[in-house]
Amino acid sequence: MIEKLSNLLHQRKVFNRITLLMGKEVTIKTAVYTNGRLLIYVDTESHRFTFALTPEDEVQIVAIDDIFSISDLKLQLKIAEIIQSHISLNNHWRDQ
């Protein structure tokens, strides 16, 4: 399941949107979390955003690390929105 999510999030379409939004190179990683949730990490040199994907494919903000301003929080919300919309448009990803 982690590999499927990783493949979905590394499609150029979503990866490019997040990179463009951040204005710098990003790294996206996935990992297992408790209660059937999958963690999604979006890292840059200056920020690390952590999200959880629920079994119902809902993206949730897990941790607010390195948030120093309202603009940082807005950025995290925008990334969550990009990931959520990409997962919603590819709702068959778990079956592949």
Language-model features: locations:
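Acidic, low-complexity, intrinsically disordered interaction modules
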Residues: 30-73
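Intrinsic disorder/low-complexity segments in short proteins, especially the signal peptide
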Residues: 10-14, 25, 43, 58, ...
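Mixed-charge, Lys/Arg-enriched low-complexity segments
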Residues: 2-8, 59-96
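N-terminal cationic leader/targeting segments used for protein routing and processing
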Residues: 17, 25, 49, 91-92
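Negatively charged, low-complexity tracts enriched in Asp/Glu with abundant Ser/Thr
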Residues: 1-37
